[in-house]
């Protein structure tokens, strides 16, 4: 069974232009609920133990809202990517925390 989920939320959303100037793309709202909240709600139904958010751009917003909170026994952990290095860099940084293949 897969216990951990990794969500890459570090992109700066440059293709969205001014829309993401103050709000990171995953925190943009669709029907008054952020995309990330919608995704987390769907993942919680599958009873994962941990959700890792790989943060870079405007990381303080993710840490403030999500870091080390529990939702129905699922722990959300924010990881600071440091300098954004793309998908490979984010996954390389978290490689020692993930117990399962994914």
Residue locations for each model-derived region?
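Conserved N-terminal catalytic core of the sugar/cofactor nucleotidyltransferase
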Residues: 2-7, 15, 29, 33-102
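Active-site glycine-centered loops adjacent to acidic/histidine catalytic or metal-binding residues
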Residues: 11
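Conserved catalytic-core motifs of eukaryotic protein kinase domains, centered on the activation segment
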Residues: 18-21
């Amino acid at each position: 069974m897969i216990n951990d989920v990794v969500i890459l939320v570090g992109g700066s959303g440059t293709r969205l232009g001014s829309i993401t100037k103050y709000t990171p793309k995953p925190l943009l709202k669709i029907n008054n609920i952020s995309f990330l909240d919608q995704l987390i709600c769907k993942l919680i139904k599958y009873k994962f133990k941990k959700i890792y958010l790989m943060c870079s751009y405007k990381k303080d917003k993710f840490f403030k809202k999500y870091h080390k909170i529990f939702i129905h026994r699922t722990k959300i952990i924010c990881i600071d990517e440091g300098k954004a290095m793309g998908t490979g860099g984010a996954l390389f940084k978290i490689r020692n925390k993930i117990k399962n293949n994914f």
